[in-house]
Design a protein with these regions (language model features):
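Structured beta-strand-rich cores of soluble
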Residues: 1-89
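Residue-level signal for well-ordered alpha-helical segments
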Residues: 18-22, 60-63, 77, 112, ...
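Alpha-helix initiation and N-capping motif
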Residues: 38, 62, 76-80, 94-97, ...
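Soluble periplasmic/extracytoplasmic beta-strand elements of cell-envelope proteins
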Residues: 40-42, 103, 181-183
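A generic structural micro-environment signature
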Residues: 33, 47, 77, 115, ...
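Active-site neighborhood of thiol-dependent amide/isopeptide-bond enzymes
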Residues: 86-180
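Juxtamembrane membrane-insertion context
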Residues: 50, 62-63, 69-71, 108-110, ...
């Protein structure tokens, strides 16, 4: 751990801890962190294969449906229509998620874009106007388009892997590695991550090569935004999307 001076937040629990899978939690230390401090993080990562996720049940628990398929009032119809176009003819939630993920990864990455104009919906601005953005935009767009398709989804925030230092055998993670991605709920497997941000390494799903590379949906539509400015959807943000 190499924190900034006076830092108390850590990116994972410093002691054994159990967190319900649908809750948001931030763990903090009760003292300052110093150079050389160490802690151990153990994570339970799914070993579900592509085929497992394609064949997963679509019977979602009520507590998941209650929280993670919500669409805000006034959500832009143009974004909802794009979701319908991208998932048309696809039967499984996994393949729908991959179709949306692939479309978003084709949008150029730019972490220095200006803020949306006053009154312009952030997702419409990202998808149809400026057509570039950073991780918060990609993740929010994917999570909301999945919800339009009736698939439980949320955004999550943390850090990318950083840079590996061969001499120390450690990864160096800084504030610049802060990142937002998408998690999709699959019964029996829980929350499974997806990476819609262009420029980030795609997530490898066991076993090896993903056999669902959008053969039926390789042609990506060019949607036409709805007439006029849609009512504002939530501004892209980090943290699990409630």
């Amino acid at each position: 751990v190499r924190p900034q001076a006076g830092a108390t937040a850590i990116p994972a629990a410093g002691a054994p801890a159990e967190t319900p899978p649908v809750e948001f939690t931030m763990i903090r230390t009760n003292r300052e962190l110093f150079n050389g401090d160490r802690y151990v993080l153990m994570s339970a990562a799914t070993d579900a294969t592509v085929r497992d996720l394609q064949n997963a049940s679509q019977e979602y628990p009520p507590e998941i449906l209650d929280r993670f398929v919500q669409i805000p009032e006034g959500f832009p119809e143009s974004v909802a229509e794009l979701s319908r176009q991208l998932t048309a003819g696809i039967t499984t939630p996994y393949d729908k998620a991959k179709a949306i993920e692939a479309y978003l990864r084709s949008i150029p990455y730019n972490d220095a874009i200006p803020a949306p104009p006053a009154g312009r919906d952030p997702l419409e601005y990202f998808l149809f106007d400026i057509k570039e953005g950073y991780c918060d935009y990609y993740a929010t767009a994917m999570a909301m388009m999945l919800r339009v398709a009736g698939i439980p989804a949320r955004t999550a925030s943390g850090y990318a892997e950083g840079l590996f230092d061969e001499e120390s055998g450690a990864y160096f993670v800084t504030e610049r590695d802060a990142h937002t991605w998408v998690e999709v709920f699959f019964p029996e497997y829980g929350w499974v991550e997806f990476e819609p941000t262009a420029g980030e390494s795609p997530l490898d799903r066991l076993p090896g090569e993903d056999p669902t590379e959008l053969t039926a949906n390789s042609q990506q539509p060019e949607p036409t935004p709805a007439a006029g400015d849609a009512a504002a959807a939530p501004t892209p943000q980090t943290g699990p999307e409630e």
